[in-house]
């Protein structure tokens, strides 16, 4: 088997959608026994005068809009661990937290996808 190069791996990642990348990350966590809560982020050596950019955000569904069915499907897509009934309850109980500890870039993509469905999302 040929060795996978860094460049070919990155190119493969670029061709994946968000769901596939999330599945890959979860598989890597399981394969290598990575516990995200055990990761320590190094702080700056200075006195902390600079404002740090958020590295993880929370996505909240504020309003599902007029057509809830596609919103429920999108909730299931980004949170495959939820059953159809749980996703429906989450959408019906808006405002409700959709996802925690999401990278800001991924959160913006998710927000855009929900906005296209007529739902209102906030990123905190």
UniProtKB/Swiss-Prot annotation:
Keyword Calcium: no
Coiled coil: none
GO CC entries: cytosolic large ribosomal subunit
InterPro entries in the record: Ribosomal_bL12, Ribosomal_bL12_C, Ribosomal_bL12_C/ClpS-like, Ribosomal_bL12_oligo, Ribosomal_bL12_oligo_N_sf
GO molecular-function terms, A-Z: mRNA binding; structural constituent of ribosome
Tagged with keyword Ribosomal protein: yes
Gene3D superfamilies reported for this sequence: 3.30.1390.10, Single helix bin
Keyword tags: Ribonucleoprotein, Ribosomal protein
A Pfam family: Ribosomal_L12
BP terms from Gene Ontology: translation
Quaternary structure note: Homodimer. Part of the ribosomal stalk of the 50S ribosomal subunit. Forms a multimeric L10(L12)X complex, where L10 forms an elongated spine to which 2 to 4 L12 dimers bind in a sequential fashion. Binds GTP-bound translation factors.
Family, as annotated: Belongs to the bacterial ribosomal protein bL12 family.
General function of this protein: Forms part of the ribosomal stalk which helps the ribosome interact with GTP-bound translation factors. Is thus essential for accurate translation.
Protein name per Swiss-Prot or TrEMBL: Large ribosomal subunit protein bL12
